[in-house]
């Protein structure tokens, strides 16, 4: 029917309105309630219209339509008044409410006019009609002619027309009864009148129904117009609602931004709290570190005390390790050279590999460029294909638009055809119309109920969401306030605690600083005391050195006076070798010994000539001196005999590399050192072998020993001579050469070279370092002890001369002097000479010296060269500067 489907020209459909009613709960509550009220009133009006139409088709005996229409009007007015009251409570709804009120007035006027017309026609019909008809269904179900007239069968016709039965053949019947015929005729006449009246009433009813149909069609047309007006009004209402909804979304957006700002402030506060907590934790960690540092400093103090005690013990061990480290340094230098060569090889390989990588990179770049060109070409092809596809899609869209216009036109034609079909169906079947009206009524009721439930639930959900949002907002605000208050309190408490802890920490640090300052002052005072003590010790050492030099000078002058009393024969013609100027010597403990005594050129007689003159002058003297002097004079050589000055000895460490052994000594014998030059001149630009002392010092010592030998008294019965024999040690062993008891003349000079091992071991004693001597210096010595050492040497030389053992070897003499010096510096009595009961022990130990010479020299190599050695402008030691040793 027309009421069920809205007009096609209406801009707003019920489906759209129903879909708008099911909006999410986030929309405005006011708009949802107004929408629900309008839809409720619309459905109620439709329901009232359907009820009025159904009542128009009821029987006249039923209650007059007055009551139904009145009830419908009252219900409509009541629903609209309720909607008006609800809308008055809302904002911005007055205009829409007035429009709805005007629509309600129009509906009431239309309903009143239709009610008056229906009532008037019904009353006229009841006056004319003698028979009451209940409804259209009873009219359709009645059978007026069939029920009242007899059937058209033969017996019925005979009953109706008994006169005409005699015309038929058959047995004769009874004679006709005229009274019965009259009665039947009267009954037929009465029935015919009744049928005519009934037909007239039916025609009147048909006219009435036609009039009602015309009224219903007019009412439908008016309703369509009213619905269109309502659609327009609702469109304006929806526009207002949309504006209101936009304002509501703006307000919600502002609230959301405020909420985000509040959350940002809260997050910032939390970050500040976390930063403060981190700073407090860092402060606690720093405090714990300071405490740990204080404990560590206490431990370090104790450790320093222990180390101070242990350093005095480790000093000697470190000095011994220096020598081993020197060897390791040489090995490390050799390894460094090999590693440097390996590094150069690796660099060459790396350069080649880099060139290979560069070539490979160029190849990859060319390949990449080719691939890029190929991809560019393929991209252009794909672009052309995409353009063609876009053109085809555009043409397809145009065809689709044409098809859509055609479909719209066909839909319009279909709507017109449908309207015509509906009109024809309305005219053909009233029963179908009633069924559809009932179905529409039920659907409308169900839809109204469903919409009411949905709107109620939506309203409740929206109210609940709003209440929950407000409660959550209040709750969050309260929580933020409480948290901010708690955080401020905690921060204040933590700040106060932190200030207290910082004050305590500053006090402790001040106390610790004061303690350290006191300790530093004490240590500085102690250092000053140690420096003063060290200075005093240095002064004592210098004084002792001066006294020792004075004592040695006195001995030298005494020996020189003894020598000057003898006759001075002419000097024999012998090849003289100028002593090489001694290079810079490395001092002990970083100081250089200075000797103020310049050398004096005093002519000396040869040893052999002096011994012969002494023998000629004193005929009763024994010949022991003659047996010992030739070897010593040959060993000392002419340069030693020509010197008259005393030069003190200075120990010189062995700085030759450890590989210098017998092969290095073999290289020392050059072509210039021939047999005609047994004592070759040394190169003044070289220092000679680093293991040997300078030539001037060695020759001075030899001269001094020669004078001691020749001026010593000849006593054979010295009971304490055995006590002067040196004690055999682990590092150096004394060897004593046996000599025949018979005095002999000095043999001629033989041009025979001594073996390299023996030649290298003659003066190796000077290369032996002394850790005790370096550690303590000469500060512990005394002039009395130095005098005793010289007396011991003199006694030893006299013992050799008395027993007839021959000349004292220079190696044994130097070793004995070194032992005496060690025993004087150590003060522990390790090297005190003891009695040697076996006279042949010297020969056995003498044979072991060449085999022990090389390890002793290797062990004596210092680890590092001293800076004084590096800074000197003299060249290093050369193994070729000294020739062979001749006997």
Curated annotation (Swiss-Prot):
InterPro entries, A to Z: Centrobin
Transmembrane segments: none
Coiled-coil residue spans: 191-557
Sites of Phosphoserine modification: 81, 782
Example GO molecular function: protein domain specific binding
Principal cellular location given in the protein's record: cytoplasm
GO cellular component, one term: centriole
A GO BP annotation: mitotic cytokinetic process
Keyword Electron transport: no
Top-rank lineage group of the source organism: Eukaryota
Composition bias type Polar residues, residue spans: 133-153
Protein's cellular compartments: Cytoplasm, Cytoskeleton, Microtubule organizing center, Centrosome, Centriole
Amino acid composition bias (Basic and acidic residues), ranges on this chain: 113-128, 670-680, 832-849
Location of the region described as Required for centrosome localization in the Swiss-Prot/TrEMBL record: 360-887
Spans annotated as Disordered: 1-34, 110-153, 465-486, 566-591, 636-695, 824-887
Keyword list, A-Z: Cell cycle, Cell division, Coiled coil, Cytoplasm, Cytoskeleton, Phosphoprotein
Keyword Iron-sulfur on entry: no
Subunit structure: Interacts with LYST.
Function of the protein: Required for centriole duplication. Inhibition of centriole duplication leading to defects in cytokinesis.
Protein name: Centrobin
Species classification: Eukaryota, Metazoa, Chordata, Craniata, Vertebrata
Gene encoding the protein: Cntrob
């Amino acid at each position: 029917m027309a009421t069920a489907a809205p007009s096609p020209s209406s801009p707003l459909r019920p489906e759209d309105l129903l879909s708008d009613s099911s909006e999410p709960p986030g929309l405005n509550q006011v708009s949802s309630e107004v929408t629900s009220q309008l839809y409720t009133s619309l459905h109620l009006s439709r329901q009232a219209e359907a009820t009025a139409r159904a009542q128009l088709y009821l029987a006249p005996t039923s209650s007059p339509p007055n009551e139904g229409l009145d009830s419908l009007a009252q219900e409509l007015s009541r629903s609209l008044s309720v909607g008006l009251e609800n809308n008055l409570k809302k904002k911005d709804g007055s205009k829409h409410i007035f429009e709805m009120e005007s629509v309600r007035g129009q509906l009431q006027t239309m309903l009143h006019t239709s009610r008056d017309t229906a009532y008037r026609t019904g009353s006229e019909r009841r006056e004319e009609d003698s028979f009451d008809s209940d409804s259209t269904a009873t009219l359709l179900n009645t059978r007026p002619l069939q029920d009242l007239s007899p059937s058209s069968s033969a017996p019925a016709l005979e009953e109706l027309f008994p006169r005409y039965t005699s015309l038929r053949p058959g047995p004769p019947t009874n004679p006709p009864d005229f009274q019965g015929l009259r009665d039947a005729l009267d009954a037929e006449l009465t029935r015919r009148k009744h049928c005519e009246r009934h037909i007239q009433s039916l025609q009147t009813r048909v006219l009435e129904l036609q009039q009602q149909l015309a009224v219903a069609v007019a009412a439908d047309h008016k309703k369509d117009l009213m619905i269109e007006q309502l659609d327009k009004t609702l469109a304006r209402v929806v526009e207002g609602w949309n504006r209101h909804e936009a304002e509501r979304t703006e307000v919600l957006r502002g609230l959301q931004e405020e909420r985000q700002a509040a959350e940002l402030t809260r997050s910032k506060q939390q970050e500040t709290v976390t930063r403060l907590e981190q700073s407090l934790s860092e402060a606690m960690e720093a405090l714990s570190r300071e405490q740990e540092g204080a404990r560590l400093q206490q431990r370090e103090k104790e450790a320093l005390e222990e180390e101070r005690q242990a350093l005095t013990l480790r000093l000697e061990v470190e000095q011994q390790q220096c020598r081993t480290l020197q060897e390791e340094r040489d090995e490390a230098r050799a390894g460094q050279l090999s590693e440097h060569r390996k590094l150069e090889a690796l660099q060459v390989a790396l350069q080649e590999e880099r060139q290979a990588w560069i070539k490979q990179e160029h190849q990859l770049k060319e390949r990449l460029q080719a691939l890029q060109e190929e991809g560019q070409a393929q991209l252009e092809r794909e672009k052309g294909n995409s353009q063609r596809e876009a053109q085809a899609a555009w043409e397809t869209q145009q065809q689709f638009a044409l098809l859509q216009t055609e479909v719209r036109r066909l839909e319009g034609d279909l709507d017109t055809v449908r309207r015509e079909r509906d009109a024809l169906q309305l005219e053909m079947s009233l029963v179908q119309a009633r069924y559809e009206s009932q179905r529409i009524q039920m659907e409308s009721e169900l839809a109204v109920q469903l919409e009411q439930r949905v709107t109620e639930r939506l309203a409740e959900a929206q109210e609940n969401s709003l209440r929950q949002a407000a409660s959550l907002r209040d709750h969050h605000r309260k929580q933020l306030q409480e948290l901010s208050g708690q955080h401020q309190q905690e921060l204040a408490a933590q700040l106060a605690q932190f200030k207290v802890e910082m004050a305590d920490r500053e006090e402790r640090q001040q106390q610790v600083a004061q303690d350290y300052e006191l300790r530093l002052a004490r240590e500085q005072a102690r250092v000053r005391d140690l420096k003063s003590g060290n200075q005093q010790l240095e002064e004592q050492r210098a004084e002792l050195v001066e006294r020792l030099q004075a004592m040695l000078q006195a001995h030298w002058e005494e020996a020189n006076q003894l020598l000057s009393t003898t006759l001075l024969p002419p000097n024999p013609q012998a090849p003289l070798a100028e002593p090489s100027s001694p290079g810079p010597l490395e001092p002990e403990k970083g100081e250089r010994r200075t000797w103020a005594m310049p050398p004096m050129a005093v002519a000396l007689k040869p040893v052999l000539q002096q011994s012969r003159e002494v023998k000629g002058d004193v005929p009763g003297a024994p010949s022991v001196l003659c047996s010992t002097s030739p070897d010593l004079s040959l060993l000392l050589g002419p340069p030693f005999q020509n010197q008259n000055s005393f030069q003190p000895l200075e120990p010189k460490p062995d700085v030759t590399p450890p590989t210098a052994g017998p092969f290095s000594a073999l290289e020392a014998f050059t072509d210039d050192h021939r047999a005609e030059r047994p004592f070759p001149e040394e190169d003044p630009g070289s220092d000679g072998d680093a293991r040997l002392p300078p030539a001037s010092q060695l020759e001075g010592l030899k001269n001094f020993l020669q004078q001691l030998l020749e001026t010593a008294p000849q006593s054979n019965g010295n009971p304490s001579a055995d006590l002067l024999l040196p004690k055999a040690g682990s590092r150096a062993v004394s060897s004593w050469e046996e000599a025949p008891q018979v005095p002999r003349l000095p043999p001629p000079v033989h041009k025979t070279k001594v073996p390299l091992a023996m030649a290298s071991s003659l003066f190796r004693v000077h290369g032996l370092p002394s850790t005790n001597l370096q550690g303590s210096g000469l500060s512990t010595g005394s002039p009395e002890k130095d005098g005793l050492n010289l007396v011991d040497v003199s006694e030893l030389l006299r013992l050799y001369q008395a027993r007839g053992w021959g000349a004292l070897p220079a190696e044994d003499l130097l070793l004995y002097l070194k032992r005496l010096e060690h025993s004087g510096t150590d003060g522990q009595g390790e090297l005190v000479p003891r009695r040697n009961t076996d006279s042949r022990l010297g020969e056995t130990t003498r044979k072991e010296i060449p085999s022990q010479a090389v390890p002793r020299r290797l062990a004596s190599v210092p680890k590092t060269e001293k800076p004084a050695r590096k800074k000197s402008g003299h060249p290093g030691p050369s193994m070729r500067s000294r020739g062979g040793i001749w006997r």
